[in-house]
Amino acid sequence: MQKLLLALIVGLGGFLGASLRYLISIFAAKNFGGNFPYGTLIANILGALLIGFIMEFSMDSALISSNMKLFLTTGIMGGLTTFSTFSYETISMLTNGNITLGIENIILNLGCSLLFVVIGQKLARILF
């Protein structure tokens, strides 16, 4: 029964994260256009920032239970961030001759995601 409950916790978080990613993609396409996958980039950066913060905060705090951590990280962040979409969009750009955009997409997604994990960790240390 415990494993089923944990699966439901992750599933609910995944639903919320994926829904948030969808809303971010709609917002980004409307506001920034469709020439570059800004929605995926924003979702990946936001997810990196939040997972860095949550993981750092949870190491030194009893305020986040193991179930809440599972819900937030594996669930919401797992549904929000998307390596498969990033990969597909990058390959599509490269195979369609948009080499510069493809390379920019790789650099921005990887560079910003790594940077924002560190920023999230530092924010957690500063705030808590």
From Swiss-Prot:
Q: Which domain of life is it from?
A: Bacteria
Localization recorded for this chain is: Cell membrane
* Principal cellular location given in the protein's record: membrane
Provide the GO MF annotations for this entry: fluoride channel activity; metal ion binding
Q: How is its activity regulated?
A: Na(+) is not transported, but it plays an essential structural role and its presence is essential for fluoride channel function.
Look up and give the membrane topology term. Answer: Multi-pass membrane protein
Indicate the segments annotated as coiled coil, or none if absent.
none
| Gene Ontology BP annotations | cellular detoxification of fluoride
Gene Ontology CC, one term: plasma membrane
In which residues is Na(+) bound?
G78, T81
User: What keywords are annotated for this sequence in UniProt?
Assistant: Cell membrane, Ion channel, Ion transport, Membrane, Metal-binding, Sodium, Transmembrane, Transmembrane helix, Transport
| InterPro entries per UniProt | FluC, Multihaem_cyt_sf
One of its Pfam families is CRCB
User: Membrane-spanning regions, if any?
Assistant: 4-24, 39-59, 71-91, 99-119
Swiss-Prot/TrEMBL catalytic activity: fluoride(in) = fluoride(out)
PANTHER family membership: FLUORIDE EXPORT PROTEIN 1-RELATED
Q: Which family does it belong to?
A: Belongs to the fluoride channel Fluc/FEX (TC 1.A.43) family.
Q: What does this protein do?
A: Fluoride-specific ion channel. Important for reducing fluoride concentration in the cell, thus reducing its toxicity.
| Name this polypeptide is given | Fluoride-specific ion channel FluC
Organism field: Clostridium perfringens (strain ATCC 13124 / DSM 756 / JCM 1290 / NCIMB 6125 / NCTC 8237 / Type A)
